[in-house]
Structures are given as structure tokens and as C-alpha cells.
């Protein structure tokens, strides 16, 4: 079974994201900040990471840079899920190593479209 790590400081967003991704057949784990997410990736590298941009302790950008430097860290597909919508943020996220970008709030259909584009749906 494919594994997804949902990284967001909002418990509500993590739960909604979990529900959507489980509907796609993923096993899901959660982290509330980038540092916790790196620890989870060391334990088990996921196939997919849904990543918030603005988080305490370690931002999404800081996380993805650290992830891509880890052993096996180039493997997971990363989708930024954020309220940051200007073109500069999108470019920064993709340049840092994200595979796709989705605006919050998102629904089942939007996420499915994005996952299809990166080969995971």
C-alpha cells in the first residue's frame, strides 16, 4: 500500500487531508511541523508528502530542502498544500523540489487531478 505523510500545523487540515488521501487507497501518517516530518521520513520514507508552507519550527520550504538532501529523499512526490498563491511562491516551491502545488482549501477532485499529474492516482 502506498504511504502518504500529511504535514500541516492545523489538526483540522491534517484530518481532512487524511480522509481524502485514504479514499485514494493510501496509508496515511501525520506530522505537525517540518522537523517532526523529517523524523517520520527517517523512520519510513513515504511515497507522497502533502506539505504545508507556513509552519512553526521548520517551514515547508526548509523541510523540502532537507528532505531532498536525505538518503532516499528524492523519492517521495511532494505536493505543497497552502494558502500562498502568488506566482513567486509557486516558483519557489517547485524550485525547492516540490512536484505539484495545490491551493487550500482543496477538495477530492482537485487533489486527484494533481496526483494524476504526478503519477500517483
Task: List each language-model region with its residue ranges.
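Alpha4 helix (beta4-alpha4-beta5 surface) of REC/receiver domains from two-component response regulators
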Residues: 62, 85-100, 110-113, 117
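The feature encodes the CheY-like receiver
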Residues: 56-57, 86, 105
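Two-component signal transduction core modules
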Residues: 49, 101-102
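Acidic catalytic/metal-coordinating carboxylates
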Residues: 33-36, 59-65
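Active-site beta3 strand of CheY-like receiver
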Residues: 44-50
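Two-component/phosphorelay signaling modules centered on CheY-like receiver
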Residues: 11-29, 118
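Conserved Asp/Asn-Gly motif in the active-site loop of CheY-like receiver
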Residues: 31-35, 90, 108
Amino acid at each position: 500500500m502506498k504511504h502518504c505523510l500529511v504535514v500541516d500545523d492545523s489538526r483540522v487540515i491534517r484530518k481532512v487531508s487524511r480522509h481524502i488521501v485514504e479514499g485514494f487507497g493510501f496509508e496515511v501518517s501525520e506530522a505537525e511541523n517540518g522537523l517532526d516530518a523529517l523524523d517520520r521520513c527517517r523512520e519510513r520514507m513515504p511515497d507522497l508528502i502533502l506539505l504545508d508552507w507556513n509552519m512553526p519550527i521548520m517551514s515547508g520550504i526548509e523541510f523540502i530542502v532537507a528532505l531532498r538532501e536525505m538518503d532516499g529523499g528524492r523519492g517521495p512526490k511532494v505536493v505543497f498544500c497552502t494558502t500562498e498563491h502568488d506566482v513567486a511562491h509557486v516558483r519557489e516551491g517547485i524550485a525547492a523540489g516540490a512536484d505539484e502545488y495545490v491551493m487550500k482549501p482543496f477538495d477530492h477532485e482537485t487533489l486527484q487531478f494533481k496526483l494524476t499529474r504526478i503519477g500517483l492516482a
